Regions:
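Feature targets compositionally biased, intrinsically disordered low-complexity regions
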Residues: 1, 15-16, 50, 85, ...
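Mixed-charge, Lys/Arg-rich low-complexity intrinsically disordered regions
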Residues: 2-53
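A generic structural signal for residues embedded in beta-strands
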Residues: 55-58
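Short beta-strand-centered aromatic/proline hotspots
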Residues: 63-81
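Short, solvent-exposed secondary-structure boundary/capping segments
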Residues: 82-92
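Intrinsically disordered, low-complexity, charged/polar segments
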Residues: 93-195
């Protein structure tokens, strides 16, 4: 068990359970993005940078799209043509989401330390991107049947995008921001279970 899982356990213990920890984490996020002096979660208009986690409102305005998440929490991968690519963490089961970020944090700990050293330590916008790839993340998620969580986003359709600092991954993983349009998460998982 690495940093992310240990911190989630600690937050749950401090809050008197995981449900209370989730509520505390959601309050932390809302309070932090509203306060411009706090930089661990900050609004940004930049394109995705690999390895960073973004939370934003989304409206793809595509008439033929059967479903979408209005409020994705995305681990950024790379840019594809004019779109941003990333893993919508909302589509993953809680245990897999925690395991993915725990594994990634442990594997990239030296990069994370370097990317967030000095004044960048608590500044999500200033932290350097990480070296993670589409192929690596696709292979990881495919083992569990959740590679469908890799999604593309049109940058101009994102609103109120916030970036989260690496040290706050445990808090953002606790948050439940999913807001699906057209389906439930169970229906999405059923759609992709036959692949």
């Amino acid at each position: 068990m690495g940093y992310v899982k240990n911190r989630i356990k600690e937050l749950s213990r401090e809050s008197g359970g995981k449900t209370s920890a989730r509520k505390t984490a959601e309050r932390w996020f809302e309070d932090t993005v509203k306060n411009r002096r706090l930089t661990e979660a900050s609004y940004t208009r930049t394109r995705f940078e690999p390895g960073k986690i973004y939370v934003f409102e989304y409206n793809p305005i595509t008439e033929n799209l059967p479903w979408f998440d209005r409020n994705p929490v995305v681990l950024a991968l790379e840019q594809v043509d004019s779109n941003d690519l990333g893993i919508n963490l909302n589509l993953l089961p809680v245990e897999l989401k925690e395991q993915l970020l725990d594994d990634l944090y442990n594997r990239l700990e030296n990069q994370i330390d370097s990317a967030s050293s000095g004044k960048k330590a608590l500044s999500a916008k200033s932290q350097k991107p990480l070296r993670i790839t589409y192929d690596g993340m696709k292979a990881y998620l495919k083992r569990f049947g959740f590679d469908f969580a890799i999604r593309q986003y049109v940058p101009s359709r994102k609103i109120d995008q916030a970036v989260i600092s690496y040290n706050r991954w445990p808090e953002i993983v606790l948050c439940d921001f999913i807001d699906l349009n057209g389906v439930t998460v169970q229906q999405i998982r059923a759609m992709f279970s036959n692949r």
